[in-house]
Structures are given as C-alpha cells and as structure tokens.
A protein has these predicted regions:
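Long, highly charged, low-complexity intrinsically disordered interaction regions
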Residues: 21-32, 47, 51-53, 65-189, ...
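Long, charge-dense, solvent-exposed interaction surfaces that engage phosphate-rich ligands
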Residues: 38-41, 45-58, 62
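Conserved phosphate-handling catalytic cores of large alpha/beta enzymes
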Residues: 2-42
Length: 208
C-alpha cells in the first residue's frame, strides 16, 4: 500500500499540472472569443489539454479504488481537479464542430467517442484533433479565425440548461450575434421567456 500510495500521489501531482494548463488554455480561448480573434489553434490547444487531463484523471481511478479508505483525501483531490471536464469537452465540441446550425446529439456523441478512442500519440498532433471536429488540419490553417456557437459562454451563466442554449444557438447562429442581441430579441428564441432573456443578457454582460 505504501508504494501504491506514493504512485497515486505522484499521479495526482501530474493531474494538478494538467489542470493548471487547462485553466490557462481555457482563459486564453475565452478572452480570444470575447475579443473576436479566436483561431483554430486556440481551440485545439484547449481540447488537447482537456483530453490529457481527462485521461490522466481516469488512470488514477483504479489506483484509488484499490487503496480503498486510505485514499479518501486523494479521492477528494482528484474530484476537485477533474471538475466538470467531461461536460467542458462536450461544450467545446458543441461550439466548434463543423456542421450547419445546431450540432445534433448523434454528431456530438460520435465526436466524443472518437476523441475517447484517439491513441495517445495522436492526441499530441493538432491535425488528428482538427480532423475529428472537421476543422482545417494543415499547419497554415491553424491561424484561421473561428467563431464559437456560444455553448461554453452560455453554460457559464447560472441555471441556463443545454436545451435553452440549443434554442438560442438555433435562433442566432453564433456567439457574436447572441452577444449583440437585446433581451427582447433573445426572447424570440423558443422556450426563452422575457425573464430568462434578461437573465441571459445580464449574464453575458458580466462575462464580457
């Protein structure tokens, strides 16, 4: 158990490093999105780091189960470091996978499955990740600008559920159009009441 505990602690330290890199990449993309200069490489940079964190955290799960009650503190630490990484990856895919309009569930599920099955060696190449999202995969295309649909930003507003985000994205198309909309315009989207529209508009203002 002593050796296993040492290994588990070392693995947690690695996950901590990945979490730090995810947070930095996430902040970088968020700022780029809000200022309209997000590029393909920013998206792939974040996705790569998210997947590394997700895989590293899963690798520790079995060790923690084996250690049982001795690993209670490590279990809490891992849970905190993992955060909502699965949902975060899904929202990033929803924002940037290439398709017309709102990406349907089968497309998202397929992309998430493909990302899970991606060999570790491909995880470190931008081209492999780009292809799974339908983004341009060549070196010179990495600086191409991209606009998110708005899933990641809208999901950061308290109590805004994904089905509401789907309707808003369906109505407006992308984050720039959503941010430019007045509350009464947001309320045109299906299932978005005037009250919700004001809440969302206020949330977007706070995040800007």
């Amino acid at each position: 158990p002593g050796v296993m505990m040492t290994r588990a602690r070392q693995a947690i330290a690695t996950v901590e490093q990945y979490r730090s890199r995810v947070d930095k990449a996430n902040q970088r993309l968020a700022v780029a999105e809000m200022n309209r200069y997000a590029a393909v490489e920013d998206v792939l940079h974040l996705l790569q780091r998210q997947l590394l964190l997700q895989r590293a955290a899963r690798d520790i799960d079995d060790q923690i189960i084996e250690l049982g009650t001795d690993a209670r503190q490590l279990r809490l630490q891992l849970s905190e470091l993992r955060g909502t990484i699965d949902d975060d990856i899904e929202m990033l895919v929803c924002d940037y996978i290439v398709t017309d309009g709102v990406p349907h569930a089968e497309l998202i599920d397929g992309a998430l499955r493909d990302l899970e099955n991606l060999p570790d060696s491909d995880l470190l190449t931008s081209a492999a990740l780009a292809r799974l999202l339908g983004l341009p995969a060549t070196e010179e295309n990495l600086v191409e600008s991209v606009t998110p649909r708005g899933y990641r930003v809208l999901s950061r507003i308290p109590r805004v559920q994904k089905f509401l985000i789907d309707h808003i994205v369906e109505e407006f198309g992308d984050l720039d159009a959503i941010r430019a909309a007045e509350p009464e315009q947001l309320a045109v989207a299906e299932h978005v009441s005037p009250l919700w529209a004001r809440h969302i508009a206020e949330g977007l203002r706070r995040l800007s």
